Structures are given as structure tokens and as C-alpha cells.
């Protein structure tokens, strides 16, 4: 939904997504540091990469850096200093999951996770119950949504996940699709 609202597809969202993920990651980490300042660092803090001064964004590879080189918009140096002083309250903070195939979020005004939608309207459920799910703002954005079956390659999806992974401290589960057209 967020990509459709911003007139982006998985193939051209990387810079905007990087900026959004910076804010998302920074906010979560900062909140954990504030909790650590108030209540103390988590018990396992000394055994984490956080204690080594490493942030999720520091774990990129040369391949990532050759694909994406976006400006950092936030003061990561100050956040790193706060972590060094107070620690973090949560050893693990940021997880992403694909979710489009399994989530059943209804009426929330959003789509189900980070992978593309399968269809604009879809039926999901178990053996005893089926429910229809309609993408948000269908009438206005129907031509803006990026459907998984519109992709003939996984490249854009994998690059999108790479941008997201840079700012998460846990591995992302990735579903890939193949449209043999």
C-alpha cells in the first residue's frame, strides 16, 4: 500500500524505501536506548553486536554498497554514542516478514507485509472460514499496485528486500515467485 500511495513499484522504490527504513530503524533503536536509560540494558547486552558498537546498517556487504549508495539522513553517530553509554533494552528489535501469503489482517487499511500483493481482491481463510481482502483505496490506486505476478524476474523484489535488510537486526524470510510468461 505504501508503495502504491507513493507512486512507486518494487523496481524504482529503493531510495525512498531507504529513507523510510532509516527513520523506522532509528526510531526503534532510539526507543530501546531510552528504555535502557530508564530501566537498564538487557541482560545479554554485553554479548550483542550492539555492545560492539555495531548497528544493523553497518552489516552491509561490498555488493550492497555497489548497488545502493544513499545519503544518511539521520544522526547515527549520536545514536551510537547513546548506545555506548546506556546500552539497549532489547537485544533483538526489528524483524520483517513477507506475510502476503499467510497474514490475515482485515480492515486495517494496509496490505500484509513487505512482499507484493497477489491480487487486488483475494479470498483467504482456513477450512471453516473464508474472508475477502481488498487492497486499501482500490478505486484510486488500482493501477499503482505492484502485483507479484506482474514480475517476470525476482531482481526488483530481492533488491527491495536488501534495502529493508540493511536496517533490520534479524534475517528476513523471503518468498520468491516465478511467472513463466
Question: What is the predicted function of each stretch?
Answer:
Residues 1-63:
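Extended, well-ordered alpha-helical scaffold/bundle regions in very large, multi-domain proteins
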